[in-house]
Amino acid sequence: MEPIPSTILTGFLGAGKTTLLNRILHEEHGLRIAVIENEFGQENIDNEILVRDTGEQIVEMNNGCICCTVRGDLIVALTSLAQKRASGEISFDRVVIETTGLANPGPVAQTFFVDEEVGANYMLDAVVTVVDARHAMTQLDQHEEAQRQVGFADKILLSKTDLVDAAAIEALKTRLHRINPRAPITTSDFGRAPISDVLDLRGFNLNDKLELDPDFLRADDHAHDHGHDHEHGEHCGHDHAHGEACTHHAHGHDHHRSHHTDDIAAFVFKSERAFDPERLDQFLGSMVQVFGPQMLRYKGVLSMAGADRKVVFQGVHQIMGSDLGAKWGESEIRGSKMVFIGKNLPKDVFIAGLEQCLV
């Protein structure tokens, strides 16, 4: 049986996650979706399957946030769903996990890679973050959880854009791209985002696609004199030094000279020289061991000495994996591009260390 694609839907309090989710659940899209909801502090049916007339199955838990403190509960819920599906008791095509507004998506994402049974039954597709356009600037200023949710995102949906003017939206987009230049941003008025904006994003696939916001790259190039830029990343799944999730963020490099300096920020490394595989593996392993809790997402498409294929790596916190990508084209310029998103990461240490790994 193919692993069940799973989406983590996150966003700060009141951003509009539930509005969006309710619409997805009731839309005629032909998909059977099992939703794991976390209604913190409300009375819900614990570990019960509720079958709505649309045919989706929903698991509601009231044991606290879906985060590392209750990771065991999430594993139990996912395992129970998979068993009920295998026995024919319920039927669903995919899972959406809605986190509370205060949840850190990191531990939720890690669950798919650290638990063997969950990893065998499910495939983490993406983290989708809903951002309240009206209140986001204040939330990002005051709450590191809001910054972490943006930093982890594979896709950002802006809600309540009808309540602010175009200039405010552009300023917010600039700030979001500085935190996470890897995640595309789309607008979602009152939960009207197409379902394609939330499902089948393949954000955690090991592929050789690494697209970054061009304005971020231009600003970053101007900010540094070396021949690299600095970006951020994604993730896959072998364990490099098991870890709990991050409750920290990365110190902001203010590429856009905004008035806001966010704790979580991204940087990019680029080079047209090839890496020595052994040196790079050793260096990245040591960085993950030391800074893993601060490393939210990271991804790279790499050129390795003596290899005719690209190497793709990505990680979440201490969980890092790699795989072979496509062959380099005959006329393609070989090179490496890596992006790191995190809190207070020593960028200069990373850059200098990566340069030492080049042939």
What residue spans do the PLM features occupy?
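Helical mechanochemical/support elements of P-loop NTPase systems and associated helical scaffolds
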Residues: 5, 9, 29, 41, ...
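Nucleotide-state-sensitive switch-loop elements of NTP-binding domains
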Residues: 2-139
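C-terminal accessory "lid"/substrate-recognition subdomains
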Residues: 155, 164-329, 333, 343-359
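Phosphate/Mg2+-binding loops and adjacent switch elements
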Residues: 83-197, 202, 212
